[in-house]
C-alpha cells in the first residue's frame, strides 16, 4: 500500500524501482501517459461516481473535499473515496532497457520494495493451497486484500484501518438498520429499512471502503451505503414510517422479531436472510449465501442437525487452532465454499480417510458435496482438502470417542424461513433418527456390494454358460507349479545317479502336461484364444472380455490377487494420453505413476511429462491412446482370461528377469540357461506345448541365429498373424499329436533306459554327438559310434553326464515324436521366418545373450570347465549354474569346432571313424595352418585380440593344444548344439514355467549363437547385432543341410550338385529344402524342430557361399559323413569348418566359376536334389540333430561364408520359398494350403525385411572394412591357434569389400 504522502501519479524523471523479470530494479520514468481514476461521493445525495482526475478541482488525496464536474458541466462538492493510478509509465533501467509498466509495477525509490500488504503476514493463508481454485479478484471484499497494488496504493487505508472497518461491518451484519439518504432535490432527508448483509452477497455491487452492503426491505435490492448513514433500529427506536414505507417497515420488524424473510426476497436470494440471521457464523454464512446464489443445489438441502453442525464446526475450529493450524478463511473447493461438516460425514460414511484408496471414490465424494466437477483433479483436490482440514480432527475424534450426528442433509425443493426449517428439522430429526441410522448402515454395507453385485451376477451367468472353463483353468493352474517343483528337484539331484529317475519323472510329467495341453487346446479352439500372439489375443479379448473379467474375479477372490486380474501398464511406462475434449483435445506424453481398478475399470494416475505435478490426475484407461514406445504393444484393458498357459507366463514374467516376446510389455530379456536336465525335460514336454512351445522354440531359434534383421514393427504384427494362423491350424492336429506322444512315451522310456546304460558305459561326450544324429540308427550302431568316439574323449564326468542326458533325450525324443515334430516342423518353418521377422525383440535378446556369451566365453576353456564342475556341484544355483555350464559348453564348442573341422574332413574323406580319431591332432594343425596360410600372422593376432576384446575383453581361449580338452570341447559343443536343439524343440510344458523354459531355451540358442563369441566365431560375436550374424546363422543352416546331405548317401551326387548350385545361387532353396527335410526328420522323431528351423533359415544364405568352393568335396564329404554313422554330427561340424578353411583357400578362385555353373544348373537340380535331400534326410533322421547342433557350427560356417562371399560377390537367388515336394506329399491338403499361405506371407515379409536389411548391411560392411583396415595396421602374430583366430578370419571375410551387398542380402534373408 502506498504511503499517505505518495503522489496519486508519478511525473517524468522520477526515480523508481520498476519490476523487471519479477525483480525490482532501479529505473527512471521516461514518459507517462496519465490516467488517474477518482471515486467520489457527492455530499448532497451520497451518490458515488468514478471520474477522471481532469474533472476534479482540488487536491487529489483520499478524504479531501473537492469539486467534481457533473454531466451537465456544473461542479458539485464531493469527497474523494479512492484514487486509482491507471497511468502507463515508460521507464529506463540502468542498462538502457526500456519497459512500459503500470503503476502497480513501480514504487518510489528508497521505499521498501515490498509494500506491507505484500508480506506473507498479510496474504490470506489459504489462497496458495486452494487447490484447483485460482485467486479471483471479483469479490471486492476479499479482493481488496489480494488485489493489485494500484487500488491498494490509492486507497491509503492501512491494514489496521481495514480491520477496524471489518469489525464494524461484522457488528452490524444481520441487523435491521435504517439507512438515511437525501432526496435528489436535496429538499428532504429520507430513510428506508434494510438488512445489513455480507459484502460478498452481491457480485455486481462493489462495496467501497467505509461502505456496507444492505438489502432494502422496501424493494429487496442490494445497495452499498456509507457506514455513517446506517443506524440500527429496534421496535422502540424506529423512526415513524410514512405510508410508502409502512409495509417495508413491518417486514423489517417482523424479521427483527421472528427472522421471517420477506416474501419478495425468496425468489432472489433464499439464503440471504437465513444466513444473516445466524450471527454466530455471519461471515461464513454470508459467504455461503453468495455461493448458493450461484448453485441451487446447496439451497435445496436441509441440514438435519443444524446444532450439530455448529457444534462440529466449533470443535473443529478450536482443534485446528490448538494445533497451530487455524482455519482463518473459509475453505473453498471448486469455486464453492466447502461444507466441512458434510465432507466429514461423507468420508465417515465411507469408513474414514484411510479406507478410501481409490481416486474415483474421492471424485464421488466431491460430487456428493454438490460441487460441479471442473477438472479431472476433483477427486485429488477434495482428498487434499480433507487431509488439510479434517484428517487430524478425524483422528482426534476417533481417539477421544467424540461422535456427531452423521445424518446427511436431505434435499428439499421449497425452503421456508430458517425458524420454520428448524422446527421441522427437529421433528424430522426425532422421527427419522433411527431411520437415518439404518439407512446409513445399509449404505455403508452396500457401498462395496453395490459394485460387486453386478459383476457377481454376470459371473454366475457366465459360469452357468461355460462351467467347463473354470475347472479347466484350475487344473491348468495346479499343474504348472507341480512341474516347476519337479524341475527344481531334478536339477538338484546328482545328475549321474538319477538320470533314469529324471527321465521317468519327465515322462510322467509329459502325461500330465499332455492332458493339460489337450484341455487347453480344446479351450483355445473354442474361444480362439491364442494367448501367445498379441494380435490374436487382442481379437479374442474383445470377444471374451466380460467372461474373462468375471472368471478372473472369482479366481482372484480365491487367490487374493485382485490386482493381477487386470492387465495394466506398469508404473513408469510412458504413454500417449488424450487430454481435453472436442477441438481442444490434444495428445500428451505422460508417465504412469499408479494404477487402480474401480468398478471394473482400470484407472491410471498419470504425470504429464514436462508439466507440474499438480496436473497429475487419475484417468480412465480409454484415455490412453498407446504406449509412447511404438514397439510396445497396446494393452487392451480387460481382465485377462488366464489360460493355464497365460497364467504360467504371467507368473514367470513376474518372477523371471526377462520378458519374452510373448510378453505384452517388451523388455530386453535376460536369459538363463537350462541345465541339460531341463533340456531333456523340455524335449519331453515339447509335444505337449505345441502351441506355445512352437512359438517359443521358434523365437529361440531365431535368437539362436542371431537374427539381426531390422524389420518394421508392421512385419512383426504380420508375423504374429501368421503365427496365429499356424497355431489355429495346429490346434486341430495337436490332439492327434498328443496321442502319438503318449504312445511314444512308453517307447521313449524303454529306449532311454537302454541308451542311458550304454551311454553311461561310453564316453558321454561322444555319445551326445552320436546320439543327436543317430535317432534313425539302431541302438547298436549308436553304441559303436559312441565307442569309437569315446576312445578320443577325456571328459569331466559332470559334463559327460549332462551331455548324456541331453543326447538320450534327443534320441528318444526323436524316435518317439515323429508326428509331433512334423506338426512342429511346419510351425518351425513358418514360425522361424516369423520369429526371425520380428527383429526388434529378437535382436535385443540376441544382443543380450551375446554380450553374456562374450563375457563368459572369453574366459579360458579350463576356467569354463571349472565353472561347469562348480555349477554341477551347486545345482541349486539354477540360473547361474546353468549359465556357467552353457558358457563352458560354448567355449568347448568352439574348440571342438576347430578340431572337428579337421576331423570331419578326414572322416568324410576316409569314411572311417578310427582314422578320424588318429588324425584329429593333425587336422587341427591343418586347420590352423590353412587359416594361418591365408591370413598374415599379424592380422590373425590382431583379430584374435579383437574378437577377444569383443568377447568381454578377456584373454583368447587357449589354442586347441590339448587333444583331450579339445575333444571334450567338441563333444561339449555338439552336446550344446544338441541340447539347444532339444530345448528348442521342446516347447516348454504348458504349465511348467513356460517362461523360464522359454528363457532357458532362448538362452541355449543364444549360447549357440554365442559360441562364436567365445572367440571361435567373430561372426557371431560381432554380428549378432548385424545382419552378418545371420550369415553365420545361415552357415549353421548350411551345416544342417550338409548333414542332411550326409544322410542321403545314394543321393550324394545329386546332393552335391544341388548343394553347390543351391549354395551359390539358391541359398534360399537349400534353406527351404533343409527346412522341409528338417521337418521330415522331425516328423520321424528328430528332436529339434525349432533348432533346425533356425538353422535352416540361417543356413540358406551362408551355407551356399561356403559350399560353392567345395561343391564336390563338401557334398562327398557329407555323403561319407552319413555313412560315417554315429559321428556324423561331429563330422558335419568338422566338415563345415573344414569347408570354411577350404573355402578360404579355394574360395577366391572357385567361387566365381562355381556360382556361374551353379546358376546354370540350378533350376534343374533344384527340384530333384531338394527332393532327394529331403528323402535322404528322412532316412537318416539322425542327422537332424546335427542340424540342430548347427548353432555350434554356425559360427564356423559363418567363417566359411564370409570368405566365399568375398570372392564370389554373387547374389544368392532366393528360392527360399521353394520346398521339398516330398514334404508336401506327406501332408494333408489343409496342411499344404496353410504351408503355401505361410510361404506367401513369408515372401512378403521377406521382401520388406530385405529392403531394410540391405541398408543396414551396407552400413555394417563399411564398419567391418574399417575394422579390417585397423586390424591390418596393428596386426600381430597369434601365439597359438585359438578359436579366436577363426573369429578373426570370419571378421576379415565379413569385412572384405568383395562381399556384395547382395550376398549379404541373402544372408539376411536366410536369417529371416
From Swiss-Prot:
SUPFAM superfamilies, A to Z: ARID-like, Chromo domain-like, Tudor/PWWP/MBT
Low complexity bias locations: 1028-1037, 1087-1101, 1272-1288
Region annotation (Disordered) ranges: 124-166, 266-306, 458-577, 635-680, 708-894, 909-1212, 1252-1288
Tissue spec: Highly expressed in the testis and in breast, lung, colon, pancreatic and ovarian cancers. Expressed at low levels in the thymus, prostate and ovary.
Xref: Gene3D superfamilies: 2.30.30.140, ARID DNA-binding domain
Classification via Pfam families: ARID, RBB1NT, Tudor-knot
Basic and acidic residues biased stretches: 483-496, 643-656, 722-754, 778-787, 807-816, 828-852, 909-927, 995-1010, 1056-1065, 1196-1208
GO molecular function, one term: transcription cis-regulatory region binding
Coiled-coil residues: 728-754, 1231-1270
The keyword Membrane is annotated on this UniProt entry: no
The protein's assembly and partners: Component of a Sin3A corepressor complex consisting of SIN3A, SAP130, SUDS3/SAP45, SAP180, HDAC1 and HDAC2. Interacts with ARID4A. Interacts with AR.
Function: Acts as a transcriptional repressor. May function in the assembly and/or enzymatic activity of the Sin3A corepressor complex or in mediating interactions between the complex and other regulatory complexes. Plays a role in the regulation of epigenetic modifications at the PWS/AS imprinting center near the SNRPN promoter, where it might function as part of a complex with RB1 and ARID4A. Involved in spermatogenesis, together with ARID4A, where it functions as a transcriptional coactivator for AR (androgen receptor) and enhances expression of genes required for sperm maturation.
Protein name as it appears in the record: AT-rich interactive domain-containing protein 4B
The encoding gene: ARID4B
